[in-house]
Amino acid sequence: MDQIAAASNGRTINVEGLSKEVLRRLGEIVAQAEAGPQPVQHDGFYEMPIPIGISVRHVHLCPEHVAILFGEGHNLSSYQELYQKGYYAAREHVMVVGRKRCIEAVRVLGPTRPYSQVELAQTDALVLGLKLPIATDGADPASAPITLVGPEGAVTLPGKGKGGAFIARRHMHMSDITARKLGVKDRELLDLHIDGPRPTTLHGILVRIQAGWRDEVHLDTDEGNAVGIRSGQTGTLMIPVRA
């Protein structure tokens, strides 16, 4: 029955029409939430609030190295989902061996990748006695050799673009939808302004674009400590307005 008489005053309510309107408004709310914060144009830039993730030292592993470190047939198990859909902090840990010292219980992130890599902060590199490059991933020719030890074995990553250790370049994950809307290109460099106890602007945020990604800037612990922020706080991404 499409219409029901209101008990109080005899008015009729179009239930079907009301339901459609409620669903329409809910759809708008969901779409706005998924789209995230909207940019504001100011002084030749789009200023867009962006969540910041502080990346603690961690390891990515290829399937072959998972088997060596944790045993044949072992699969990484999820401990906690990360902000990016499909990515997680695994329950597994490894020991990272440097020239001077070792760092134990370094978290593995999943899922597995085509090659293994170790992402560290400069402070970690000093503890290990390593001189590490700033790079985007373990396929970078400048990545350094490093040894990982797990409960079932050890593996040495060769570096030089074949998987290794490096200091992660400050970067952001951007969805293809946001990129198209703002005219941003993959591997473009943008600036990030951060308010707080130590307000600053970080230059050279490398943009990496992929369908389905959630917009998020990644800094390492040294950078986060330097500007006094933690994961989950927001900064302002500065995107030049194209003519």
Identify the residue ranges that each predicted region occupies.
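Short beta-strand-centered segments at strand-helix junctions
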Residues: P51-R99, E104-R187, D191-D195, H203-T234
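C-terminal functional extensions of proteins
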Residues: G232, M238-A243
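Short, low-complexity, charged amphipathic interaction modules
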Residues: M1-V40
